[in-house]
UniProtKB/Swiss-Prot annotation:
Family: Belongs to the MurCDEF family.
This protein's UniProt keywords: ATP-binding, Cell cycle, Cell division, Cell shape, Cell wall biogenesis/degradation, Cytoplasm, Ligase, Nucleotide-binding, Peptidoglycan synthesis
Protein name: UDP-N-acetylmuramate--L-alanine ligase
Pfam family, one: Mur_ligase_M
Matches recorded under InterPro entries: Mur-like_cat_sf, Mur_ligase_C, Mur_ligase_C_dom_sf, Mur_ligase_cen, Mur_ligase_N, MurCDEF_pg_biosynth, UDP-N-AcMur_Ala_ligase_MurC
Cellular component per GO, a single term: cytoplasm
Class of the enzyme per the UniProt entry, highest EC level: ligase
Length: 475
């Protein structure tokens, strides 16, 4: 059943005594989406960020009061303050909020409030969250269910990462990086996979991380549904502890929604899903890689379990253009040594880099892959150092940028120079360290060959750098 936006108030009560909501770090992907939803629900929104950008400009045009830089006076009039996990304790707006006894909450607590009166579908996991959330959102939109969605990245076909729908459905990416997904109380929870990442949150203890995921799944009501990947041995080990209905998906023979006959032609994937009722569904995807077949099958399983027709599911998946910065093709360019294709990808964990390389190899045949890699966080580089050395040795040519610190202090032996040294010692590829990114175009022109696929890889500023490169190459 759909409702007009005026009727939303009848099913989603107003937050009492809350007129103005202030966001510290409003430009972040997760923060901006929640701000946009609340703005469209009729709340006054203000927010600050260290830099202006497309996201902050869009929010300002929609009616939010945006400040660039942080100052105590920015919180004037706020009924509640929302902080992102990147905000430090000495932030002047955070300090002023506490002094004035204004409630300060995490981003996930506000997302939980938005979800409280809705039918929530939360997507968690180390990899694939953003794409899976986007796919489910598009299926529900295609089925004319007008869902609200809040994603950690751009939903390309919607042109934004958040949307206020006029129905009870809310589809959201659940963030395990700071364990804040424990605030959410969804009806359906998807877990795509689980690997050691953000281990500082879990005190370096993978068992603690597993226990936190089980706790997240226990937030489901007894009549809720957990959708979990059967290909992930860690998740399958947790299934007996979940205590809720569990549906599985994957390439595994044990999966309830089983993928068979996967083939990739160019950057297109097609395969068959065998469903629990012996139904067979043929799926076409316009995003490459087996990892995307898994993401799509998670979305298909949720939709089937919730009674959505096959036609809407298959149309949405065939039309799916990807999530922002997920194997984002920036174009083909003529360079002095020949024609190259440039792709931007957000993957910043060794497993994500590995599946991106595999998808590129499948679609690009025997052509060379040239990677521009920017490590993200010193702590991740330290914790997964050997895995990075192995996976970055799989490309044909490697340009390494300096570590994107994301606010962290440098860690000895976890910098780009150390990575390059270890990769060189392995002997499969000879990396080139480029600390001055203004030199990147010149360095590339010296090493690229006709037909190369250039992969700009990482979660930091490498996307902006690669897009700047694409712009300069167009001229």
């Amino acid at each position: 059943m759909k409702h007009s936006h005026e009727e939303i108030r009848k099913i989603i009560p107003e937050m009492r005594r809350v007129q103005q909501i202030h966001f510290i770090g409003i430009g972040g992907a997760g923060m901006s989406g929640i701000a946009e939803i609340l703005l469209n629900e009729g709340y006054q929104i203000s927010g600050s960020d260290i830099a202006d950008g497309v996201v902050t400009q869009r929010l300002a045009q929609a009616g939010a009061k945006i400040y660039i830089g942080h100052a105590a006076e920015h919180i004037k009039g706020a009924s509640v303050v929302v902080v992102s996990s990147a905000i430090k304790d000495d932030n002047p707006e955070l300090v002023a909020s506490k002094q004035k006894r204004i409630p300060v909450i995490q981003r996930a607590q506000m997302l939980a409030e938005i979800m409280r009166f809705r039918h929530g579908i939360a997507v968690a996991g180390t990899h694939g969250k953003t794409t899976t959330t986007a796919m489910i959102s598009m299926i529900y939109t295609q089925a004319k269910l007008d869902p609200t969605f809040v994603n950690g990245g751009l939903v390309k076909s919607a042109g934004k990462n958040a949307h206020l729908g006029a129905s009870r459905y809310l589809i959201a990416e659940a963030d395990e990086s700071d364990a804040s997904f424990l605030h959410l109380q969804p009806m359906v929870s998807v877990v795509t996979n689980m690997e050691p990442d953000h281990m500082d949150t879990y005190e370096g203890d993978f068992e603690k991380m597993k226990a936190t995921y089980v706790k997240f799944l226990h937030n489901l009501p007894f009549y809720g549904l957990a959708v979990m990947c059967a290909d992930d041995p860690v998740l399958m080990e947790l299934v007996p502890k979940v205590g809720r209905q569990v549906i599985t998906y994957g390439f595994s023979e044990q999966a309830d929604y089983r993928i068979e006959d996967y083939e990739q032609t160019g950057f297109q994937g097609h395969y068959t899903v065998f469903c629990p009722n012996n139904e067979r569904i043929n799926v076409l995807l316009n995003v490459p890689g087996k990892h995307n077949a898994l993401n799509a099958t998670a979305a298909l399983a949720v939709a089937k379990e919730e009674g959505i027709a096959n036609e809407a599911i298959l149309e949405a998946l065939a039309d799916f253009q990807g999530a922002g910065r997920r194997f984002d093709q920036l174009g083909e360019f003529i360079r002095p040594n020949g024609k190259v294709r440039l792709v931007d990808d957000y993957g910043h964990h060794p497993t994500e880099v590995d599946v991106t390389i595999k998808a590129a190899r499948e679609g690009w045949g025997d052509k060379r892959i040239v990677m521009i890699f920017q490590p993200h966080r010193y702590s991740r580089t330290r914790d997964l150092f050997d895995d990075f050395v192995q996976v970055l040795s799989l490309v044909d040519a490697l340009i390494m940028l300096d570590v994107y610190a994301a606010g962290e202090a440098p860690i000895v032996g976890a910098d780009s120079k150390s990575l390059c040294r270890s990769i060189r010692n392995l002997g499969k590829v000879d990396p080139i360290l480029v600390s001055d990114t203004s030199q990147l175009g010149d360095v590339l022109d010296q090493i690229i060959q006709d037909g190369d696929l250039i992969l700009a890889q990482g979660a930091g500023s490498v996307s902006k750098i690669s897009r700047g490169l694409a712009e300069s190459w167009k001229n």
